[in-house]
Amino acid sequence: MPQLVLASTSSYRRALLEKLQLPFITDAPETDETPHAGEPAEALVQRLASAKAQALAGRYPQHLIIGSDQVCVIDGKITGKPLQYSTAVKQLQQASGQCVTFYTGLTLLNTANNSINCTCETFDVYFRTLSQAEIDGYLLREQPWNCAGSFKSEGLGITLFERLAGRDPNTLIGLPLIALTQMLIEQGVNPLTVKPVE
């Protein structure tokens, strides 16, 4: 089995990939994540997921490299990680009572034969109407500065929602495992037939 490389330093993506019980390593890709002018969210996340995987290709021949990138769209505008409290407040104020769509790009690059598979998964988050006290209380408790959309759905962020809609809930956290499993099987790596990590 070719070794897997997760082109990410995200602890969330690492924890998701561990669910598949396959051996893998992580490495930080050097990529410019600046959106191109007028670039749609779907194209942006697919381009960045591919760029992350390809950034590590020279270091990992004969490997399967997984790249992923995520943005959310609030009121038609691409939104990324807030990085600070004031931006997170604005993002949650904009999301209050709205449907926010998350776009997660996923790439699997086989450096042995240079084949590449790329897709985009979407996931809709319907926010309930939030008071300023709820927004402040949430942000002070969870501090989601490195999370697109300013929340952690796997934590207290679940209290912000009215409902969720999408094919794979892992997509919302940053790594679409259903799509990734399909890509891995196409490359001859089936999580159910490979010896699991102990």
Curated annotation (Swiss-Prot):
It catalyses: N(7)-methyl-GTP + H2O = N(7)-methyl-GMP + diphosphate + H(+). Signal peptide: none annotated. The record marks 12, 70, 154 as: Important for substrate specificity. Its EC number is 3.6.1.-. The active site is at residue 69. It is found in: Cytoplasm. Keywords: Cytoplasm, Hydrolase, Nucleotide metabolism. GO terms for biological process: nucleotide metabolic process. InterPro entries: ITPase-like_fam, Maf-like. CDD domains: Maf. GO terms for molecular function: nucleoside triphosphate diphosphatase activity. One of its GO terms (cellular component) is cytoplasm. Its cofactor is a divalent metal cation. Belongs to the Maf family. YceF subfamily. Nucleoside triphosphate pyrophosphatase that hydrolyzes 7-methyl-GTP (m(7)GTP). May have a dual role in cell division arrest and in preventing the incorporation of modified nucleotides into cellular nucleic acids. This is 7-methyl-GTP pyrophosphatase. The lineage of its organism: Bacteria, Pseudomonadati, Pseudomonadota, Gammaproteobacteria, Enterobacterales.
